């Protein structure tokens, strides 16, 4: 079993950090987006350009993700799908999605969408900071190490 790293790359601020972790651990990496993005020219990193549209990149990732795989995404519904498939998911700010918290994250997202549809102003996420980048690197490295240890030899 070859573990894989999937990056939900549209608007992902930590692609370069993810590339470094993937290279260090020898993870096959798919960078999935709906437009061309420059990726390092290495055999372990492959760019996948999907059609434009809602959830097209998410669907591509979810259909291929399985146990031992790690997904970088800020998309809560995709993280839920990844967890259900046996994979692990981490947000660019270092937040690791878990079975224990994904239900409340989905509910909060749904409430926010409902309020916005009614014209309510809701605050957006905090600005991305260097501390987020550091938390992400630590979380991704830990997830990859954990997945590698769990993989059959």
UniProtKB/Swiss-Prot annotation:
Query: Which organism is the protein's source?
Result: Caulobacter vibrioides (strain NA1000 / CB15N) (Caulobacter crescentus)
Q: Which HAMAP family match?
A: UPF0178 (MF_00489)
Q: Note the superkingdom of the native organism.
A: Bacteria
Which family, according to UniProt?
Belongs to the UPF0178 family.
Q: Which InterPro entries match?
A: UPF0178 (IPR003791)
Q: What protein am I looking at?
A: UPF0178 protein CCNA_01273
Source organism phylogeny:
Bacteria, Pseudomonadati, Pseudomonadota, Alphaproteobacteria, Caulobacterales
Q: Which CDD domains match?
A: PIN_YqxD-like
